[in-house]
Swiss-Prot record:
The keyword Transcription does not apply. Keywords: Milk protein, Phosphoprotein, Secreted, Signal. It comes from the Eukaryota. This is Alpha-S2-casein. InterPro entries: Alpha-s2_casein (IPR011175), Casein (IPR001588), Casein_CS (IPR031305). Mammary gland specific. Secreted in milk. The lineage of its organism: Eukaryota, Metazoa, Chordata, Craniata, Vertebrata. Pfam families: Casein. GO terms for cellular component: extracellular space. Important role in the capacity of milk to transport calcium phosphate. The modification Phosphoserine is found at S22, S23, S24. Belongs to the alpha-casein family. Residues 1-15 form the signal peptide.
Amino acid sequence: MKFFIFTCLLAVALAKPKIEQSSSEETIAVSQEVSPNLENICSTACEEPIKNINEVEYVEVPTEIKDQEFYQKVNLLQYLQALYQYPTVMDPWTRAETKAIPFIRTMQYKQEKDATKHTSQKTELTEEEKAFLKYLDEMKQYYQKFVFPQYLKNAHHFQKTMNPWNHVKTIIYQSVPTLRYL
């Protein structure tokens, strides 16, 4: 931070030209004496209004606009989202939040290839395995009758943004021992 302030002060000090007070007539005379051959350049430069360099117009920019520009550049929300991302399910009946844990683990690419190779081979099932598969089919047909809300089906697409201060409070409250009545 000190280095940044030092470089800013150095840049301002080097950027200010040291010009003595002189009238506009003197500057025109000096410029014509230096370059008498370049009449076209001098005439176009003299036609433009001459401004005194020492008279600088200062315009104040409100600090609120500066602050807004700074926070738009930083965008802190994306960092908070990256810290605490886990899928949650909103239960419509109790309106409580629970963590959504996937029931089936996702297989990697090599495991999927191996699984397709093994399924192409014919295997004979024992009676216990056949009974278990029959039971699974019955359960699947039974649970297909129930209609779940759409937002429960897409539980993995919902991400809750957490405020780090609230997260710290929950951790503290969980670690405090409580006394139960006997």
